[in-house]
Amino acid sequence: GSIPACGESCFKGKCYTPGCTCSKYPLCAKN
């Protein structure tokens, strides 16, 4: 798997950094 590299946590299932998703819950990861 890839390493989360978005520097934020999921918030209510969403990530606010462009190109990032909550696929590595509870962390955001590059989509």
UniProtKB/Swiss-Prot annotation:
Function: Probably participates in a plant defense mechanism.
InterPro entries: Cyclotide, Cyclotide_sf
Family to which this protein belongs: Belongs to the cyclotide family.
Cross-link position per record: Cyclopeptide (Gly-Asn): 1-31
Reported modifications of this chain: This is a cyclic peptide.
Pfam families (alphabetical): Cyclotide
Coiled-coil annotated residue ranges, if any: none
Species assigned in the record: Viola inconspicua
Disulfide bonds: 6-20, 10-22, 15-28
Entry remark concerning the domains of this protein: The presence of a 'disulfide through disulfide knot' structurally defines this protein as a knottin.
Transmembrane regions: none
GO biological process: defense response
Keywords tagged on the record: Disulfide bond, Plant defense
This protein's name: Cyclotide vinc-B
Lineage summary: Eukaryota, Viridiplantae, Streptophyta, Embryophyta, Tracheophyta
